[in-house]
Design a protein with these regions (language model features):
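Ferredoxin-type iron-sulfur electron-transfer modules and their immediate structural context
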Residues: 1-146, 194, 233-249
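N-terminal Rossmann-like dinucleotide/flavin-binding domain of flavoprotein oxidoreductases
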Residues: 81-88, 101, 120, 182-231
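Residue-level detector of alpha-helix initiation sites
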Residues: 89, 153-155, 178
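N-terminal Rossmann-like FAD-binding beta1-loop-alpha1 element of flavoenzymes
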Residues: 146-171
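Glycine-rich nucleotide phosphate-binding loop and flanking beta-alpha elements
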Residues: 156, 219, 240-243
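Short amphipathic alpha-helical segments
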Residues: 160-162, 184-185, 245-249
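Glycine-rich FAD pyrophosphate-binding loop
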Residues: 168-184
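General beta-strand structural signal in soluble alpha/beta enzymes
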Residues: 174, 211-213, 235-237
Length: 249
């Protein structure tokens, strides 16, 4: 796994940032990715841990972090992309906005700077999109079952995609006028530009997920209607109510 002594000789290096004067002219992402050689060097810092806490403890998805870091180090980007998608439907999103508990759990971080895991994740998936490796995966067989997914935030989108790939007919209901939930309406463009989300939504539609916008479940559709029309209902409604701090000032 990785280069045996890389973590001793290669310091942590992250993406650089645009100059402040340039950032002030737009609201887009302002990170400048590392070169391929630098990305491979950073991936090589991943050690052959007996217990990879990044994977088993730090990552809520259980991402196969040591595996795809090693594949990046070897230059096997397509395999890395496949392993990344094995546990994560939307790595281009987590690679931009996740707070990286995996890096906080990295064993190397005990006595040194942790491996740049999120940076590797983003580089892998964007390489996958650029090379055309990420394609729609419609089901090979249909089950004939119908499923309603309520809410199009990250949980709803992932549920809809996984259910569709299993062969179920899926309807994704969203009360707003565009899909995405917090990904669209709660995260600013300098962290997550909306073309990133729209690119993945197009994949879901090509796989056969049905989008239903401006539908407020419980108001426009009753629970009785949903249970009668669908074989299953998956609630992914999120938490839209704000909790303001009642403090002066």
């Amino acid at each position: 796994m990785g280069k045996v002594d890389a973590f001793l000789n290669i310091p942590r290096r992250t993406a650089s940032l645009e100059e402040v004067e340039e950032r002030l002219r737009h609201y887009r992402d302002f990170h400048i990715s590392l070169s391929e050689d630098d990305l491979r060097d950073q991936a090589s810092r991943c050690m052959d841990c007996g217990v990879p806490f990044c994977h088993g403890y730090g990552c809520p998805l259980g991402n196969l972090i040591p595996e795809w870091n090693d594949l990046v180090y070897q230059g096997r980007w397509r395999e890395a992309c496949d392993r990344l998608h094995y546990t994560n439907n939307f790595p281009e999103i987590t690679g931009r906005v996740c707070p990286s508990p995996c890096e906080a759990a990295c064993t190397l971080g005990v006595g040194d700077d942790p491996v740049t895991i999120r940076q590797s994740e983003l580089a892998i998936v964007e390489r996958g999109w650029a090379e055309g490796w990420i394609k729609p995966l419609p089901p090979k067989e249909e089950t004939g079952k119908k499923v309603a997914v309520i809410g199009s935030g990250p949980a709803g989108l992932a549920a809809a995609q996984q259910l569709r790939r299993k062969g179920h007919q899926v309807w994704l209901f969203e009360r707003d006028d565009a899909m995405g939930g917090i990904l669209r309406y709660g995260i600013p463009d300098f962290k997550l530009e909306k073309w990133v989300l729209d690119r993945r939504l197009e994949q879901l539609q090509e796989e056969g997920v049905n989008f239903e916008l401006n539908v407020d479940a419980g108001q426009d559709l009753s629970a009785q209607y949903l249970l009668k029309r669908f074989d299953a209902v998956c609630l992914c409604v999120g938490a839209r109510e704000s909790r303001d701090l009642e403090v002066p000032g």
